[in-house]
Amino acid sequence: MYDKVKLWTARTRETPDVSKFLDRAKDQIDHETGEVCTFGSLEGLKVSIYTGGISIIGSLAKYLYPNNIYPLDRHTTAQAIEKLSDSLHINLNDAKVTGLEFGTQFVMAHPVENYLSKLGDMPKLLRYHFDVGTLYYKPKGKQQLKVFAFYDKKADAVAKNMALPVGFDEANLLKYEMR
């Protein structure tokens, strides 16, 4: 059920340099303060290294598996955190979760568009139907407290060149996310 996660871990003098474990790490210098920040990725996760800490953002499911069709539970999330800790050579068990998105896929009998057209209004949220296979519910005010998204996961996977697991090639996959 866990989808995208945002993690923050404090950085001290004893924290090893994790930039050497990142893909395409780039340094950015603030010419006013002299602070050097490093931005890179690790198997699809966005990793940002600041003076005070390390930020990690992305889908732990995509990090653990070749796609995010299978949602993570508490056990597989712990496996993903352990793999990430091993890859960066730091302990992330005490990292703070600063953001968490929930989502899952439903295998439907009919095309996803048939179901999206049946979903009605939600209290205090506006309905946005951007294209045939995507539906969002967003807050009416300026604050974006939560967003609900429903979309065709198979079409999304094809657009992102993501391989679907065996047996899902012909499935109608309705993805639900709470962001």
Where are these regions (language model features)?
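Structured, helix-rich domain cores that form ligand/interaction pockets
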Residues: 1-179
